[in-house]
Amino acid sequence: AKIRMDDCVMCGHCTAVCPKNAVTISGYDTEQIEKKEKVRLNPSDVLDVIRFRRSIRRFQRKDVPSEVIGQILEAGRLTHTAKNMQDVSFVVLKKEITRIESMAVKLFKIIKPLADLFWPMARNTKIDDHFFFFHAPVVIVILAKEKTNGILAAQNMEFAAEANDLGVLFSGFFTTT
């Protein structure tokens, strides 16, 4: 076999699937791809998590430990992306939630009259001071060049949050540049 490093995107797939463990990538952390043991989720449990998922708009006012936030971010980081783009990044807001939400609410209150003209649903939308984050103790903003990649990461992150007994709200404000 000939190695073509110019075509390698350092995804680790070749190492993960080689039945003889003959392929290694210099400088690649194989811990990310080595299966320790076969782990299978109970299909009915997975379907129940999906079936009974509800958006949370009344969050408990309790701190989310850094380790839990780390697990949620790791679930997003490990998400597959189209063409191995790996274009997803995350911004965690804790202390700045109120300030950032306040700025966004001010902007939305300015543009709402225009939105009311073109978007019927906007007419029934009330914008209060906590319109975006609903007093959530932590906000994770997901950034991705390819919107689908961000959505996939958000879904995996929701599963990690659910596993930690946390509620999730997808704000639903997607933008493109």
Regions found by a protein language model. Name each.
Residues 1-177:
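Acidic, surface-exposed loops and disordered segments
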